[in-house]
Protein backbone atom coordinates (compact mmCIF):
# COMPACT_ATOMS: atom_id res chain seq x y z
CA UNK A 1 0.00 0.00 0.00
CA UNK A 2 1.42 3.38 -1.00
CA UNK A 3 2.15 5.77 1.85
CA UNK A 4 -0.04 8.83 2.09
CA UNK A 5 1.22 12.40 1.88
CA UNK A 6 0.81 14.84 4.76
CA UNK A 7 1.51 18.56 4.78
CA UNK A 8 2.48 21.20 7.32
CA UNK A 9 3.09 24.93 7.13
CA UNK A 10 6.21 26.14 8.91
CA UNK A 11 7.78 29.59 9.17
CA UNK A 12 9.53 29.34 5.79
CA UNK A 13 6.71 27.75 3.78
CA UNK A 14 4.60 24.67 3.20
CA UNK A 15 6.21 21.20 3.31
CA UNK A 16 5.07 17.73 2.33
CA UNK A 17 5.88 14.59 4.29
CA UNK A 18 4.55 11.04 4.37
CA UNK A 19 2.78 8.62 6.65
CA UNK A 20 4.53 5.29 7.13
CA UNK A 21 2.99 2.07 5.84
CA UNK A 22 1.00 1.62 9.05
CA UNK A 23 -0.54 5.06 8.74
CA UNK A 24 0.29 5.75 12.40
CA UNK A 25 3.56 7.68 12.07
CA UNK A 26 4.22 10.83 10.03
CA UNK A 27 7.69 11.71 8.72
CA UNK A 28 9.07 14.98 7.40
CA UNK A 29 12.62 14.62 6.11
CA UNK A 30 15.24 17.04 4.89
CA UNK A 31 13.54 20.13 6.32
CA UNK A 32 15.91 23.13 6.07
CA UNK A 33 16.44 25.04 9.31
CA UNK A 34 19.12 27.41 7.97
CA UNK A 35 20.35 28.67 4.63
CA UNK A 36 22.94 26.54 2.80
CA UNK A 37 26.34 27.56 4.28
CA UNK A 38 28.04 27.81 0.90
CA UNK A 39 30.11 30.45 -0.88
CA UNK A 40 30.35 33.57 1.26
CA UNK A 41 28.35 31.80 4.01
CA UNK A 42 31.03 29.15 4.47
CA UNK A 43 32.47 29.54 8.00
CA UNK A 44 29.80 31.99 9.06
CA UNK A 45 27.01 31.59 11.61
CA UNK A 46 23.91 29.93 10.12
CA UNK A 47 21.70 32.35 8.21
CA UNK A 48 17.92 32.36 7.95
CA UNK A 49 16.22 30.16 5.38
CA UNK A 50 14.88 31.96 2.33
CA UNK A 51 11.08 31.40 2.29
CA UNK A 52 9.67 29.46 -0.65
CA UNK A 53 6.38 29.45 -2.49
CA UNK A 54 4.44 26.31 -3.25
CA UNK A 55 4.99 23.06 -1.35
CA UNK A 56 8.49 21.76 -0.66
CA UNK A 57 8.99 18.00 -0.91
CA UNK A 58 10.24 16.76 2.47
CA UNK A 59 9.72 13.04 1.94
CA UNK A 60 13.40 12.12 1.47
CA UNK A 61 16.50 12.56 3.60
CA UNK A 62 18.87 15.32 2.58
CA UNK A 63 22.64 14.99 2.20
CA UNK A 64 25.15 14.32 4.94
CA UNK A 65 27.58 17.02 5.97
CA UNK A 66 31.03 16.61 4.44
CA UNK A 67 32.97 14.10 6.52
CA UNK A 68 35.42 11.22 6.66
CA UNK A 69 32.90 8.82 5.10
CA UNK A 70 34.95 5.65 4.64
CA UNK A 71 36.04 5.53 8.28
CA UNK A 72 32.48 5.99 9.49
CA UNK A 73 31.24 3.13 7.30
CA UNK A 74 33.94 0.89 8.78
CA UNK A 75 32.87 1.86 12.29
CA UNK A 76 29.22 1.02 11.69
CA UNK A 77 30.06 -2.27 9.99
CA UNK A 78 32.09 -3.18 13.08
CA UNK A 79 29.13 -2.24 15.25
CA UNK A 80 26.78 -4.42 13.19
CA UNK A 81 29.14 -7.38 13.45
CA UNK A 82 28.99 -7.13 17.24
CA UNK A 83 25.19 -7.02 17.53
CA UNK A 84 24.74 -10.78 17.16
CA UNK A 85 22.21 -10.43 14.34
CA UNK A 86 21.13 -13.13 11.94
CA UNK A 87 22.80 -13.25 8.54
CA UNK A 88 19.87 -11.78 6.60
CA UNK A 89 19.32 -8.90 9.02
CA UNK A 90 23.06 -8.20 9.16
CA UNK A 91 23.37 -8.06 5.37
CA UNK A 92 20.39 -5.74 5.06
CA UNK A 93 21.82 -3.34 7.63
CA UNK A 94 25.24 -3.39 6.01
CA UNK A 95 23.65 -2.62 2.66
CA UNK A 96 21.77 0.30 4.20
CA UNK A 97 24.90 1.69 5.83
CA UNK A 98 26.99 2.32 2.71
CA UNK A 99 28.01 5.67 4.12
CA UNK A 100 30.72 6.24 1.51
CA UNK A 101 28.05 6.27 -1.21
CA UNK A 102 25.72 8.65 0.59
CA UNK A 103 25.54 12.12 -0.91
CA UNK A 104 27.56 14.71 0.99
CA UNK A 105 27.12 18.44 0.63
CA UNK A 106 27.76 21.73 2.36
CA UNK A 107 24.03 22.25 1.90
CA UNK A 108 23.39 19.98 4.87
CA UNK A 109 21.59 22.13 7.45
CA UNK A 110 18.41 20.11 7.52
CA UNK A 111 16.47 18.18 10.13
CA UNK A 112 13.89 15.43 10.27
CA UNK A 113 10.66 15.30 12.26
CA UNK A 114 8.88 12.07 13.19
CA UNK A 115 5.61 12.14 15.09
CA UNK A 116 2.39 10.25 15.72
CA UNK A 117 0.04 10.82 12.80
CA UNK A 118 -2.37 13.69 13.41
CA UNK A 119 -0.46 14.76 16.53
CA UNK A 120 -1.17 18.34 15.50
CA UNK A 121 -4.88 17.70 16.15
CA UNK A 122 -4.46 16.46 19.71
CA UNK A 123 -5.78 18.53 22.59
CA UNK A 124 -2.40 18.33 24.34
CA UNK A 125 1.06 19.05 23.01
CA UNK A 126 3.53 16.18 22.94
CA UNK A 127 7.03 16.15 24.46
CA UNK A 128 9.84 16.82 21.99
CA UNK A 129 13.14 14.93 21.83
CA UNK A 130 15.98 16.33 19.72
CA UNK A 131 18.78 13.88 18.88
CA UNK A 132 22.32 15.17 18.27
CA UNK A 133 24.43 12.55 16.53
CA UNK A 134 27.97 11.61 17.51
CA UNK A 135 31.06 10.98 15.42
CA UNK A 136 33.98 12.89 16.99
CA UNK A 137 32.62 16.16 15.57
CA UNK A 138 33.92 14.94 12.19
CA UNK A 139 31.47 12.22 11.10
CA UNK A 140 27.84 11.20 11.28
CA UNK A 141 24.44 12.54 10.34
CA UNK A 142 20.92 12.88 11.64
CA UNK A 143 19.95 11.02 8.47
CA UNK A 144 21.61 7.72 9.51
CA UNK A 145 19.43 4.61 9.05
CA UNK A 146 20.49 3.70 12.59
CA UNK A 147 18.31 6.57 13.87
CA UNK A 148 15.44 5.90 11.44
CA UNK A 149 13.16 4.48 14.11
CA UNK A 150 9.53 4.88 15.15
CA UNK A 151 10.16 3.93 18.78
CA UNK A 152 9.86 7.40 20.32
CA UNK A 153 6.98 8.51 18.10
CA UNK A 154 5.09 5.32 18.95
CA UNK A 155 5.46 6.28 22.60
CA UNK A 156 3.94 9.69 22.08
CA UNK A 157 6.93 11.97 21.45
CA UNK A 158 7.85 14.22 18.56
CA UNK A 159 11.32 13.04 17.53
CA UNK A 160 13.74 15.39 15.76
CA UNK A 161 17.17 14.52 14.34
CA UNK A 162 19.50 17.23 13.07
CA UNK A 163 22.56 17.77 10.93
CA UNK A 164 25.33 20.23 11.73
CA UNK A 165 28.59 21.16 10.05
CA UNK A 166 31.48 18.84 10.87
CA UNK A 167 35.25 18.86 10.95
CA UNK A 168 36.92 21.83 9.28
CA UNK A 169 33.58 23.07 7.89
CA UNK A 170 32.09 23.20 11.37
CA UNK A 171 34.97 24.04 13.68
CA UNK A 172 37.77 25.80 11.79
CA UNK A 173 39.09 28.82 13.70
CA UNK A 174 41.27 31.42 11.99
CA UNK A 175 42.27 35.03 12.77
CA UNK A 176 40.71 36.26 9.52
CA UNK A 177 37.42 34.63 10.47
CA UNK A 178 37.55 36.25 13.90
CA UNK A 179 38.28 39.62 12.28
CA UNK A 180 35.06 39.51 10.24
CA UNK A 181 32.95 38.36 13.20
CA UNK A 182 31.07 40.98 15.27
CA UNK A 183 32.04 38.94 18.34
CA UNK A 184 35.71 38.76 17.35
CA UNK A 185 35.73 34.94 17.56
CA UNK A 186 35.61 31.98 15.20
CA UNK A 187 35.38 28.21 15.09
CA UNK A 188 32.02 27.17 16.58
CA UNK A 189 29.91 27.03 13.44
CA UNK A 190 28.77 23.47 14.12
CA UNK A 191 27.65 24.46 17.62
CA UNK A 192 25.83 27.48 16.20
CA UNK A 193 24.08 25.12 13.76
CA UNK A 194 22.83 23.09 16.71
CA UNK A 195 21.52 26.26 18.34
CA UNK A 196 19.82 27.30 15.08
CA UNK A 197 18.13 23.89 14.90
CA UNK A 198 16.82 24.35 18.44
CA UNK A 199 15.55 27.82 17.52
CA UNK A 200 13.70 26.22 14.60
CA UNK A 201 12.18 23.71 17.03
CA UNK A 202 11.08 26.53 19.33
CA UNK A 203 9.42 28.39 16.45
CA UNK A 204 7.91 25.50 14.50
CA UNK A 205 7.48 22.32 16.51
CA UNK A 206 3.94 23.18 17.64
CA UNK A 207 2.88 22.75 14.00
CA UNK A 208 3.75 19.06 14.38
CA UNK A 209 1.97 18.67 17.71
CA UNK A 210 5.09 19.19 19.80
CA UNK A 211 5.39 21.29 22.93
CA UNK A 212 8.06 24.00 22.52
CA UNK A 213 8.17 24.28 26.31
CA UNK A 214 9.01 20.60 26.77
CA UNK A 215 12.12 19.94 24.69
CA UNK A 216 14.74 17.35 25.66
CA UNK A 217 18.10 17.35 23.89
CA UNK A 218 20.04 14.09 23.87
CA UNK A 219 23.08 12.70 22.14
CA UNK A 220 25.82 10.09 22.37
CA UNK A 221 29.62 10.38 22.28
CA UNK A 222 30.33 13.68 20.48
CA UNK A 223 26.56 14.19 20.59
CA UNK A 224 26.77 13.87 24.37
CA UNK A 225 29.56 16.45 24.34
CA UNK A 226 27.29 18.68 22.26
CA UNK A 227 24.61 18.39 24.94
CA UNK A 228 27.10 19.62 27.56
CA UNK A 229 28.28 22.38 25.22
CA UNK A 230 24.69 23.55 24.76
CA UNK A 231 24.21 23.57 28.52
CA UNK A 232 27.28 25.83 28.69
CA UNK A 233 26.44 28.13 25.76
CA UNK A 234 24.52 31.30 26.77
CA UNK A 235 22.85 31.53 23.35
CA UNK A 236 21.19 28.15 23.86
CA UNK A 237 19.49 29.16 27.11
CA UNK A 238 15.74 28.62 27.10
CA UNK A 239 15.80 26.47 23.96
CA UNK A 240 15.58 23.15 25.84
CA UNK A 241 14.28 22.02 29.20
CA UNK A 242 15.92 18.65 29.84
CA UNK A 243 19.16 17.06 28.69
CA UNK A 244 20.60 13.56 28.33
CA UNK A 245 24.33 13.13 27.67
CA UNK A 246 25.27 9.58 26.68
CA UNK A 247 28.99 8.75 26.88
CA UNK A 248 30.32 12.29 26.51
CA UNK A 249 34.08 12.67 26.56
CA UNK A 250 35.57 13.86 29.84
CA UNK A 251 39.00 14.30 28.26
CA UNK A 252 38.87 18.06 27.76
CA UNK A 253 38.43 17.79 24.00
CA UNK A 254 37.83 21.49 23.52
CA UNK A 255 40.29 23.83 21.86
CA UNK A 256 40.97 27.28 23.21
CA UNK A 257 40.78 30.06 20.67
CA UNK A 258 44.14 31.73 21.24
CA UNK A 259 46.10 29.64 23.74
CA UNK A 260 47.23 26.01 23.80
CA UNK A 261 45.54 23.47 26.08
CA UNK A 262 47.59 20.45 27.13
CA UNK A 263 49.30 19.37 23.89
CA UNK A 264 46.68 20.88 21.59
CA UNK A 265 47.59 23.97 19.65
CA UNK A 266 45.36 26.99 20.08
CA UNK A 267 42.40 26.69 17.71
CA UNK A 268 43.48 29.66 15.60
CA UNK A 269 47.04 28.33 15.34
CA UNK A 270 45.69 24.99 14.11
CA UNK A 271 43.52 26.81 11.58
CA UNK A 272 46.43 28.85 10.27
CA UNK A 273 48.58 25.74 10.02
CA UNK A 274 45.87 24.01 7.98
CA UNK A 275 45.45 27.07 5.75
CA UNK A 276 49.22 27.25 5.20
CA UNK A 277 49.17 23.67 3.96
CA UNK A 278 46.20 24.26 1.67
CA UNK A 279 46.70 27.73 0.19
CA UNK A 280 50.24 28.67 1.16
CA UNK A 281 51.56 31.89 2.64
CA UNK A 282 49.61 33.90 5.23
CA UNK A 283 47.55 36.90 4.23
CA UNK A 284 44.25 36.68 2.40
CA UNK A 285 43.93 33.00 3.23
CA UNK A 286 40.21 33.16 3.96
CA UNK A 287 39.17 34.39 0.52
CA UNK A 288 41.27 31.70 -1.13
CA UNK A 289 39.81 28.99 1.11
CA UNK A 290 36.28 30.12 0.28
CA UNK A 291 37.08 30.01 -3.44
CA UNK A 292 38.01 26.33 -3.20
CA UNK A 293 35.41 23.65 -3.75
CA UNK A 294 34.23 21.54 -0.84
CA UNK A 295 35.74 18.50 -2.56
CA UNK A 296 39.17 20.15 -2.77
CA UNK A 297 39.09 21.14 0.90
CA UNK A 298 37.90 17.69 1.93
CA UNK A 299 40.78 16.07 0.05
CA UNK A 300 43.27 18.16 2.05
CA UNK A 301 41.39 17.48 5.28
CA UNK A 302 41.38 13.73 4.77
CA UNK A 303 45.16 13.74 4.39
CA UNK A 304 45.54 14.77 8.03
CA UNK A 305 46.26 11.96 10.54
CA UNK A 306 43.07 10.13 11.52
CA UNK A 307 43.38 11.05 15.19
CA UNK A 308 45.07 14.39 14.68
CA UNK A 309 42.33 16.45 13.09
CA UNK A 310 42.08 19.17 15.66
CA UNK A 311 38.84 20.82 14.62
CA UNK A 312 36.77 20.60 17.76
CA UNK A 313 34.42 22.98 19.60
CA UNK A 314 36.27 26.12 20.61
CA UNK A 315 36.35 27.79 24.02
CA UNK A 316 36.11 31.29 22.58
CA UNK A 317 34.78 33.23 25.57
CA UNK A 318 31.54 34.10 23.75
CA UNK A 319 29.69 31.21 22.11
CA UNK A 320 31.37 28.74 24.46
CA UNK A 321 32.61 30.89 27.37
CA UNK A 322 34.44 28.04 29.10
CA UNK A 323 34.63 24.26 29.06
CA UNK A 324 31.55 22.41 30.28
CA UNK A 325 33.60 20.97 33.14
CA UNK A 326 34.50 24.46 34.34
CA UNK A 327 30.94 25.73 33.86
CA UNK A 328 29.45 22.87 35.85
CA UNK A 329 32.06 23.26 38.60
CA UNK A 330 31.09 26.93 38.92
CA UNK A 331 27.35 26.13 38.61
CA UNK A 332 27.13 28.31 35.50
CA UNK A 333 25.47 25.73 33.24
CA UNK A 334 21.84 25.86 32.12
CA UNK A 335 19.59 25.10 35.06
CA UNK A 336 17.82 22.09 33.56
CA UNK A 337 17.65 18.44 34.66
CA UNK A 338 20.53 16.40 33.25
CA UNK A 339 20.85 12.64 32.90
CA UNK A 340 24.42 11.54 32.17
CA UNK A 341 26.03 8.13 31.88
CA UNK A 342 28.33 5.89 29.90
CA UNK A 343 27.87 2.71 27.88
CA UNK A 344 29.74 -0.23 29.41
CA UNK A 345 32.81 -1.39 27.45
CA UNK A 346 32.01 1.11 24.71
CA UNK A 347 35.58 1.22 23.40
CA UNK A 348 35.31 -2.42 22.34
CA UNK A 349 33.38 -1.08 19.34
CA UNK A 350 36.74 0.10 18.02
CA UNK A 351 38.79 -2.99 18.86
CA UNK A 352 38.44 -4.64 15.45
CA UNK A 353 39.53 -1.42 13.78
CA UNK A 354 42.97 -1.84 15.34
CA UNK A 355 43.87 -5.15 13.74
CA UNK A 356 44.41 -4.08 10.09
CA UNK A 357 46.93 -1.38 10.98
CA UNK A 358 48.47 -3.08 14.03
CA UNK A 359 51.28 -1.14 15.63
CA UNK A 360 50.83 1.86 13.36
CA UNK A 361 47.27 2.36 14.58
CA UNK A 362 48.36 1.85 18.18
CA UNK A 363 51.05 4.50 17.76
CA UNK A 364 48.49 6.93 16.32
CA UNK A 365 46.14 6.27 19.24
CA UNK A 366 48.88 7.20 21.69
CA UNK A 367 50.36 10.15 19.83
CA UNK A 368 47.22 11.53 18.24
CA UNK A 369 44.59 10.98 20.90
CA UNK A 370 45.62 9.76 24.34
CA UNK A 371 48.73 11.86 24.84
CA UNK A 372 47.30 15.23 23.72
CA UNK A 373 44.24 14.67 25.89
CA UNK A 374 46.13 13.50 28.96
CA UNK A 375 48.78 14.87 31.24
CA UNK A 376 50.99 13.90 34.15
CA UNK A 377 49.99 10.75 36.00
CA UNK A 378 47.27 9.78 33.51
CA UNK A 379 49.69 9.75 30.59
CA UNK A 380 52.28 7.81 32.58
CA UNK A 381 49.67 5.25 33.63
CA UNK A 382 48.67 4.68 30.01
CA UNK A 383 52.30 4.20 28.99
CA UNK A 384 52.75 1.59 31.74
CA UNK A 385 49.57 -0.27 30.79
CA UNK A 386 50.16 -0.23 27.03
CA UNK A 387 53.93 0.02 26.53
CA UNK A 388 54.15 -1.56 23.06
CA UNK A 389 52.06 -2.41 20.04
CA UNK A 390 52.10 -6.01 21.24
CA UNK A 391 49.67 -5.02 23.98
CA UNK A 392 46.87 -3.87 21.69
CA UNK A 393 44.89 -6.90 22.87
CA UNK A 394 44.57 -5.27 26.30
CA UNK A 395 42.25 -2.68 24.76
CA UNK A 396 39.78 -5.45 23.96
Language model feature labels by segment:
Residues 108, 183-206, 263-269:
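Alpha/beta-hydrolase active-site loop
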Residues 242, 254-257, 288-396:
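Substrate-gating cap/lid region and adjacent catalytic-acid/histidine neighborhood
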Residues 134, 189-193, 221-224:
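Active-site loop->helix "elbow" adjoining a glycine-rich segment at hydrolase catalytic centers
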Residues 237-250:
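A conserved short beta-strand
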Residues 208-220:
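Alpha/beta-hydrolase fold nucleophile elbow
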Residues 224-236:
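Short glycine-enriched nucleophile-adjacent loop
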Residues 2-188, 212:
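Non-catalytic accessory segments of hydrolases
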Residues 217, 244-246, 341:
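A short, hydrophobic beta-strand element of the alpha/beta-hydrolase
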Amino acid sequence: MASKSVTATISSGKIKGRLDSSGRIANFRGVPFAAPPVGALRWRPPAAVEPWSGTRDCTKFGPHAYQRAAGFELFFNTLIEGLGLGAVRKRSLQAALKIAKVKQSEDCLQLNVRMPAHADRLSRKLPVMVWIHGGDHTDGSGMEPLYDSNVLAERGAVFVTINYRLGMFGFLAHPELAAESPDGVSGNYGLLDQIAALEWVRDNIAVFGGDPDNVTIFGESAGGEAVLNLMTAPRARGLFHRAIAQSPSDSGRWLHLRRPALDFSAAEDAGVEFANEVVGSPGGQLSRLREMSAEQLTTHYQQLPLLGRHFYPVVDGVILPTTPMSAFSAQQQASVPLMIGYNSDEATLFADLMHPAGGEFYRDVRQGSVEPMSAGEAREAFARSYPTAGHVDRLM
